[in-house]
């Protein structure tokens, strides 16, 4: 029930291992073969991404995948199959290693902080206004 509150909520939203984890999954399994579980999880992920695109970003023309999913050819092909009108690739096609995106995002936030520039996008985060993010604690 908790996962439904997260999945069907309007953006901004986020979740991770605090909700979707091995104990959560094991509680729902009834002897299914590991390969069937993996395939189901790929389909579930691709379908939730597709639903989010259709509901909240129907105007996009490209989907650039990063993180662990970018290494999964089945995930990429499933996303492409479910989104035939989109160019579905990884951020590698932009010259950015899919595993580096999070680190680069934090570097960008640090750069913005150092220049005393705002680092959030209220329309994406739900914040009440633009803010300078972070703090500096000299040693």
Regions found by a protein language model. Give the residues of each.
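Short, well-ordered alpha-helices that flank and scaffold nucleotide-derived cofactor binding pockets
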Residues: 51, 77, 81, 112
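Short, small-residue-biased leader/transition segments that mark boundaries at the very start
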Residues: 1-7
């Amino acid at each position: 029930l908790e996962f439904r509150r997260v999945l069907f909520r309007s953006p901004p939203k986020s979740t991770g291992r605090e909700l979707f984890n091995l104990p959560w999954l094991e509680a729902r399994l009834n002897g299914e073969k590991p390969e069937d579980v993996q395939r189901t999880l790929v389909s579930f992920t691709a379908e939730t991404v597709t639903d989010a695109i259709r509901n909240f970003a129907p105007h996009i023309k490209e989907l650039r995948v990063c993180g662990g999913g970018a290494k999964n050819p089945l995930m990429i092909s499933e996303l492409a199959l479910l989104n035939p009108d989109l160019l579905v690739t990884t951020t590698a096609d932009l010259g950015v290693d899919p595993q580096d995106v999070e680190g680069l995002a934090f570097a960008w936030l640090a750069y913005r902080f150092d220049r005393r520039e705002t680092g959030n996008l209220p329309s994406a985060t739900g914040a009440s206004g633009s803010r300078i993010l972070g703090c500096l604690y000299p040693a």
